[in-house]
């Protein structure tokens, strides 16, 4: 494993920005100093003032492996991820077959070990008949346990109150919840079909999967967690009203936490007019007021982490009528450049973005030696280059297997110039390094 010396960087770490050099050896950060001299590293990079940040740890991706090779795989999506500044990911269980057994979990780990250029971990799924397996899980073997309290891609809905009570009482590790109230969604869909017939527009999606459906389910999850003392992490909040369910306190003082996803921070319901089904996702992208409330909540401790919820589908699938078009969109390749638009617009400080995409994710999932720029930690690093004139997304190749992006019309004011994964050069000067090998994430619980 080659040694790497990064000079003249603007390091962003633990609420501070400072100028300095960073040395990597045997995959780990061995020295951080204002100036490092007398080292003969195999690779030397002059950052020329670029931001040097810990790589994004994405707590929610759907890489479609196994089961949907036309949409994605660990090979294709991990390469898109490192191009977008993501050095570690945690994959969701709604694959084909679903990750509902130890055998399926082992198979996913094997697949990722062969082909992923990013570090990897896996969430275990919940069904109506695998609670004994869930209760017996080793917390160090999984990133978390995922329950779909609302119907979504993969048909893994769990809404029986007795099963939910037992799950929240017995789950041995962090429980991640997709929260939408399916009966409300079904009733809303029936009303919209009465209005539009078979020609429901994509703009109706946030009316069908509306704020009330989200709040109803999120409230239920929080109530269950409080009753049973469950370590709960509610995924992809989309509404201002849900924010009141979560405490504005440091992560170390909470047992109930929340994630927001980048598309819910960057799009709102006005974008359905131009993007249609391309931004159809569950839960739905909602109003500008909701988007702005989510942005404000990131400035406090009410929202703990930012994920992508990368969920690719083929272009042809997305061209179907609304009812038949699947929910989800590809996001990892443009994750950090897109989020850095919030920094460029003075919505978020760069230190807050780094905290919510790296520091807090490592803390929340008990991932040791990652997520920070610290001596002795794994060198999961990203150099961010300013692009004053903007970089047109349409002029860049799409690395995700699905071959499209909702950001096709955007120009980003920052780019990822270099990504190191566990000390290995994964992405540099718009080129992938296929010899990079991601490592399994460890969870110290």
What are these regions (language model features)?
Residues 1-54:
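Histidine-rich, glycine-flanked metal-binding segment
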Residues 9, 22, 27, 49, ...:
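Divalent metal-coordination and catalytic microenvironments
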Residues 9, 321-324, 375-442:
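C-terminal cap of metal-dependent C-N hydrolases
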Residues 47-115:
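Metal-associated gating/positioning segment near the N- to mid-region
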Residues 90-91, 121-124, 231-236:
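Short catalytic-loop micro-motif centered on adjacent basic/acidic residues
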Residues 110-126:
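A glycine-rich helix N-cap at a beta->alpha junction
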Residues 132-147, 153-306:
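Histidine/acidic residue-rich metal-binding segments in metalloenzymes
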Residues 199-229, 278, 299-306, 311-387:
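His/Asp/Glu-enriched, well-ordered alpha-helical/loop segment
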């Amino acid at each position: 494993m080659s040694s790497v010396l990064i000079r003249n960087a603007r390091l962003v770490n633990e609420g501070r920005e400072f100028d300095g050099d960073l040395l990597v050896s045997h995959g780990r950060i061995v020295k951080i100093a204002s100036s490092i001299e007398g080292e003969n590293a195999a690779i030397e990079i002059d950052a020329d003032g670029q931001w040097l940040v810990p790589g994004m740890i994405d707590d929610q991706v759907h890489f479609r492996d196994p089961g949907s090779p036309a949409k994605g795989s660990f090979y294709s999506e991990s390469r898109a991820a490192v191009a977008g500044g993501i050095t570690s990911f945690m994959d969701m269980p709604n694959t084909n077959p679903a990750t509902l057994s130890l055998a399926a979990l082992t198979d996913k780990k094997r697949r990722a070990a062969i082909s992923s250029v990013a570090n990897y971990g896996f969430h275990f799924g919940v069904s109506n008949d695998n609670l004994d397996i869930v209760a017996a899980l080793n917390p160090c073997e999984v990133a978390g346990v995922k329950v779909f309290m609302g119907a979504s891609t993969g048909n893994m809905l769990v809404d029986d109150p007795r099963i939910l009570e037992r799950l929240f009482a017995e789950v041995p590790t962090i429980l991640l919840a997709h929260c939408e109230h399916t009966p409300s969604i079904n009733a809303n869909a029936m009303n919209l079909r009465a209005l539009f017939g078979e020609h429901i527009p994509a703009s109706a999606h946030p009316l069908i999967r509306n704020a009330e459906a989200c709040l109803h389910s999120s409230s239920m999850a929080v109530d269950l967690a409080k009753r049973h003392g469950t370590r709960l992490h509610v995924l992809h909040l989309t509404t201002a009203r849900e924010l009141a369910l979560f405490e504005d306190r440091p992560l170390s003082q909470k047992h109930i936490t929340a994630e927001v996803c980048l598309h819910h921070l960057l799009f709102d319901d006005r974008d359905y007019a131009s993007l249609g089904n391309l931004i159809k996702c569950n839960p739905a992208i909602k109003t500008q007021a909701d988007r702005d409330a989510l942005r404000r909540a990131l400035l406090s401790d009410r929202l703990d982490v930012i994920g992508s919820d990368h969920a690719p589908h083929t272009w042809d699938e997305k061209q179907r009528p609304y009812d038949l078009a699947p929910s989800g969109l590809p996001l990892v390749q443009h994750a950090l450049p897109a989020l850095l638009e919030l920094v460029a617009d003075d919505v978020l400080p760069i230190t807050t973005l780094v905290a919510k995409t790296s520091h807090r994710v490592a803390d929340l999932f008990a991932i040791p030696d990652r997520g920070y720029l610290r001596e002795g930690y794994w060198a999961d690093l990203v150099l961010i280059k300013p692009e004053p004139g903007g970089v047109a997304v349409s002029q860049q190749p799409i690395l995700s297997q699905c071959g499209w992006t909702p950001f096709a019309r955007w120009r980003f004011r920052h780019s990822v110039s270099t990504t190191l994964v566990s000390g290995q050069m994964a992405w540099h000067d718009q080129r992938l390094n296929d010899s990079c090998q991601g490592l399994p994430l460890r969870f110290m619980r």
